[in-house]
From Swiss-Prot:
Protein name stated in the entry: Isocitrate lyase
Binding, Mg(2+): 179
SUPFAM superfamilies: Phosphoenolpyruvate/pyruvate domain
Localization, UniProt: Glyoxysome
Predominant location: other
Record family assignment: Belongs to the isocitrate lyase/PEP mutase superfamily. Isocitrate lyase family.
GO terms of molecular function: isocitrate lyase activity; metal ion binding; methylisocitrate lyase activity
Short motif Microbody targeting signal, span: 558-560
Length: 560
């Protein structure tokens, strides 16, 4: 084909010119204040190459992401909090949006109640990867529907009195933040999962630093984290996918390292300070060999557990700096033991990122001999390294993740304000304006953890130190269980009185719109569509004469 007849799609100069213009558009997008704290390891040109030729469109989820950012920014300015909880279904969603400004979709709840395989289970992220995106779509479609239904009703009013009788407008379009777990696999899985969330209505997602093959609920034992850089690659992939799709998706980086006991690989020097090793030179046989030999000899599970406990005790499992201190204290030739230990700790600490090579070198210089420390001997059967996390470990990881995410979150085992404060100060020492999230977990025993007055103020106290988004992951599940348990018990005892007085009358008294469930489900709205399609009349309208919902007028003391 000659240059004179070659069209722009097949002319390299034209193609490059078009790509350059698209890249400039992306750079303008990235220059917005929204991205002031976001680090990207790729260029606008890299993103252009990975987009197709279809015109760039704005996903509805991106509009909701902008709304989420505005919501969190307002709370950050005011020292207030966006507080929410894990929602199970559209019924819960339509009630919570009257009072709360964001919505949370929990992977735990989806695993137990909404897996796309219909096989329930605990929160191990072993459900199909479209499970949580499907729940997001379920809720987002309901949000859009109830928003349309409400607008039709309000625009059908002919007087201010009629509009006033409907009450204040409800914002059904509250931004949804969803649980992306560990990404459900490698980086290509992370990319595809992110794409699903964007397509199905999520304003934001959170992703944690656990191993995808060993994922546990954030309040279970045996949590295994991945190297720092490996999780950064996940976060980069999420943002890259969003950039390819021209989405302003909000990303929350979660770390489970505070209570982690295992690490998948020792490749990242930032993790070396927290890896546990054997410090007793008399122990030379790896734990796994001891256990394998015992198992082959017919040892029971209890016997194997006892052997492991005995081996670990004899091996004197320590972090490197602890092993160094032990060996300094045991050395008769070192007089100023405290001074030597202090000198080591002044150069090697939780936030220094020193490698094992650097720690060994300094230890040798100060001790006069090699520090005995072997982190391979106690490795777990799966090949995992033993890890001793903690708050400082969570701070280290949150700092590493912060440039790649909009919010950071550390999963904790207790609702400990001082620990939350330590984490916030540690993060904001390096990233002063970083937003933080906090899990008000139902796995905590709240009545035991603090008195009622402190429970009432806990959210606000956290908000004042930077935790702008807080959520009860499983409140939807627990309120559902409590309500059904109570009603079932009363129904078995009192028959219809339990429903009439305990449910229906309370709906009337409290103005719960689901009282008129046909109207709530959109029967009037759909009737209006049928009438519009048939020239203004429909003999099959569902809310016409004879519908039993006429029984629920403005009488009976109902607020509706």
């Amino acid at each position: 084909m000659s240059p004179s007849v070659r069209d722009a799609r097949n002319d390299l100069a034209s193609l490059q010119q078009q790509a350059a213009a698209e890249a400039e558009d992306i750079r303008r997008w990235w220059s917005q204040p929204r991205w002031a704290g976001t680090k990207r390891v790729y260029t606008a040109e890299d993103i252009v190459k990975r987009r197709g030729t279809f015109p760039v469109v704005e996903y509805p989820s991106s509009v909701m992401a902008d709304k989420l950012v505005e919501t969190l920014a307002r709370h950050s300015r005011n020292g207030t909090v966006s507080q929410t909880f894990g929602v199970l279904d559209p019924v819960q969603m339509t009630q919570m949006v009257k009072y709360l400004d964001t919505i949370y979709v929990s992977g735990w709840q989806c695993s137990a109640t909404a897996s796309t395989s219909n096989e329930p289970g605990p929160d191990l992220a072993d459900y199909p990867m479209d499970t949580v995106p499907n729940k997001v779509e379920h809720l987002f479609m309901a949000q859009l529907f109830h928003d349309r239904k409400q607008r039709e009703a309000r625009l059908s009013c002919t007087t201010q009195r009629e509009l006033d009788q409907l009450g204040p407008e409800i914002d059904y379009l509250r931004p949804i933040v969803a649980d992306a777990d560990t990404g459900h696999g490698g980086l290509t899985a992370v990319f595809k999962l992110t794409k699903m969330f964007i397509e199905r209505g999520a304003a934001g997602i959170h992703m944690e630093d656990q191993s995808s093959s060993n994922k546990k609920c954030g309040h279970m034992a045996g949590r295994c984290v991945i190297p720092v850089q490996e999780h950064i690659s996940r976060l980069v992939t999420v943002r890259m996918c969003a950039d390819v799709m021209h989405s302003n998706l909000v990303l929350v980086a979660r770390t489970d390292s505070e209570a982690a006991t295992l690490l998948s690989s020792n490749i990242d020097a930032r993790d070396h300070y927290y890896i546990v090793g054997a410090s007793n030179p008399e122990v030379t046989v790896p734990l796994i060999e001891v256990l394998d030999a015992a198992q082959q000899a017919g040892a029971s599970g209890d016997r194997l557990a006892q052997l492991e406990e005995d081996w670990c005790k004899k091996a004197k499992l320590r972090l490197f700096h602890e092993a160094f201190a032990d060996q300094v204290n045991a050395s008769p030739s070192i007089k100023d033991k405290a001074g030597v230990i202090a000198k080591f700790n002044s150069q090697i600490g939780p936030q220094t990122g020193a490698s094992i090579r650097e720690m060994r070198k300094l230890g040798r210089e100060l001790l006069g001999q090699d520090v005995y420390f072997d982190w391979d001997l106690p490795r777990a059967r799966e090949g995992l390294y033993r890890y001793k996390g903690g708050t400082q470990c969570a701070i280290m990881r949150a700092r590493a993740f912060a440039p790649y995410a909009d919010l950071v979150w550390f999963e904790s085992n207790f609702p400990d304000f001082q620990q939350a404060k330590e984490f916030a100060q540690g993060v904001r020492e390096k990233f002063p304006n970083k937003w933080m999230a906090y899990n008000l977990s139902p796995s905590f025993n709240w009545p035991k953890a603090m008195p009622p007055k402190e429970q009432e103020n806990y959210i606000q106290r956290l908000g004042e130190i930077g935790y702008v988004w807080q959520f009860i992951t499983l409140a939807g599940l627990h309120t559902n269980a409590l309500a059904i348990d109570n009603f079932s018990r009363e129904f078995s005892r009192f028959g219809m009185r339990a429903y009439a007085q305990g449910i229906q009358q309370r709906e009337m008294d409290e103005g719960v719109d689901v009282l008129k469930h046909q109207k709530w489900a959109g029967a009037e709205y759909v009737d209006s569509i049928l009438k519009l399609a048939q020239g203004g009349v429909s003999s099959t309208a569902s809310m016409g004469k004879g519908v039993t919902e006429e029984q629920f007028g403005s009488s009976n003391g109902a607020k509706l």
